[in-house]
Amino acid sequence: MPTSPPTPPRVADLFQEPRRENCPWCGSGNLRTRARAAALRPRDPGRFVVDECRECRHAFQNPRLTAEGLAFHQLDFFAGRLEDFAERSLTARAARRRRLAAARTVLPVTAEPESWLDVGTGHARFPETAKELFPYTSFDGLDPTPRVEQALREERVEEAHIGDLTDPWVLARLRSRYDVVSMFHHLEQAPNPRAELRAALAVLRPGGHLLIELADPRCAFAALLGGWWLPYGRPRLLHLLPMANLCAELKTRGCEILTTDRRAPHTPCDLSAALTIALARSPLRKAAAPLIATASALDHALAPLLRRTRFSNAYRILARKAEQPA
């Protein structure tokens, strides 16, 4: 009896993992769909769906992109532009001030750390700027891309490591080497944020400090803009962690929470990014450049007020690792 040829897998199946039925943070099956982000291009496989756990409020991409899916979107010009949209929304001077403010968070607790690892450092712009405050600190960079090697050649870091912090060989090389570890919008992209936190604490010396900055899932723009909110449209953003969950996890691992901040990390880009995403598939997107510029001006004009409200789109945590294992 003739058999029909096997059905070839859909492109979306190749680029997306099976949908999960429980929360990756607490394990609850009580989920709801929080947002459906529109495809950025007509040829894009599937859409980004963000689910939220009703129990712990952890939000996550579901189904999650596979390694092939991440690679596909990484090669896409528009998706790549979204990944660093927030950084590009700032002038060079404003971006430098922002990096200095983040580095200054550490000053009250450790005026002269010997060694500092910036995880997900990219081109190492943060270490380059932080050296102005910590001229005697040795800054190293870790990134999954060769960008960090270019940063080494341009002397923005003293050591460049390519890979993921959870890679056993990376962890073995860096264990207990650092006084400070920083992660700026890195945990959102980690497949397993808990494993990433464990690895970060492993490379810290006892009493070392962990500086983390993340998109804030409680931001009111998330509800107002829906699928056009920038974090929902970024292919590599896999998780949105509530501050309370992250603080609780750090405390469970014996850390002391020193400071939390929802004001300073706010980046004025929500309206302009939403308009950019909304017009991504429109033939009028180039003609809309003046409209996007106006939205960007409005983002910046409202920023001093919005950063004091639920419209703030990011938060920052500084934690201290226990002197002795918990």
List where the protein language model places each region.
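Short, glycine-/aromatic-enriched active-site segment of Class I SAM-dependent methyltransferases
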Residues: I212-H239, A244-E249
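Short N-terminal helix/helix-N-cap motif within the alpha/beta-hydrolase-1
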Residues: P191-A195, A222
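Short glycine/proline- and charge-enriched loop/turn segments
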Residues: F77-F85, L225-R234, A273-R281
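A short His-aromatic
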Residues: H185-Q189
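Conserved N-terminal segment of class I S-adenosyl-L-methionine
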Residues: P2-F184, R194-L197, R262-R263, R308-I317, ...
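Rossmann-like AdoMet/SAM-dependent catalytic core
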Residues: E21, T259, I277-L318, A326
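A short glycine-rich, Lys/Arg-flanked "PGG" loop and its adjoining helix->strand segment in the class I
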Residues: R194-H209
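Conserved catalytic loop of SAM-dependent methyltransferase domains
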Residues: A38-R43, L258-K286
